[in-house]
Curated annotation (Swiss-Prot):
One of its GO terms (cellular component) is cytosol. InterPro entries: ESCRT-II_cplx_Vps25-sub (IPR008570), ESCRT-II_cplx_Vps25-sub_N (IPR014041), WH-like_DNA-bd_sf (IPR036388), WH_DNA-bd_sf (IPR036390). Keywords: Cytoplasm, Endosome, Membrane, Protein transport, Transport. Transmembrane segments: none annotated. Belongs to the VPS25 family. This is Vacuolar protein-sorting-associated protein 25. Homodimer. Component of the endosomal sorting complex required for transport II (ESCRT-II), which consists of 2 copies of VPS25, 1 copy of SNF8, and 1 copy of VPS36. The ESCRT-II complex interacts directly with the VPS20 subunit of the ESCRT-III complex.
Amino acid sequence: MSALPPVYSFPPLYTRQPNSLTRRQQISTWIDIISQYCKTKKIWYMSVDGTVINDNELDSGSTDNDDSKKISKNLFNNEDIQRSVSQVFIDEIWSQMTKEGKCLPIDQSGRRSSNTTTTRYFILWKSLDSWASLILQWFEDSGKLNQVITLYELSEGDETVNWEFHRMPESLLYYCLKPLCDRNRATMLKDENDKVIAIKVV
């Protein structure tokens, strides 16, 4: 559990503090715990209740490999000290994390969602703009500018193995690439079903 700091075993962390200033710091601590844990373990998704999902097959909907959908931990439930966070407080943490741009609420289809349709969260230990800059750097360093590259190649290709975005789910990759399109540095290509499948960066 080296990815979790000592404060994770501090019982009061799991009880919503009544004082607003204390609670603000408490929420900030939780956000740091989530971000650091997911970065260290390279986890992209968490469910609404805080369950960490180590799953790179959600985009394809594959259920053939049980190991691909292995649930490893619920961060808001610490069995070692018999403490858990209430769902009401979990929702408050997610809300603040979303405001800070450190997570992205998505629905079952992998699209950005409203509170009522959210089924899980993409965890952004880098901002969307930071991911976009890193991906742009890869295009420049690898000599791929002005070439059409599929999202699958970006996520799963051998040429990205040593880059932090390797194995990023394609539905998250879309949101990380969008800032490049907004800056007129990239164009997305879609298939006959209007799904983005590739990108050209200039």
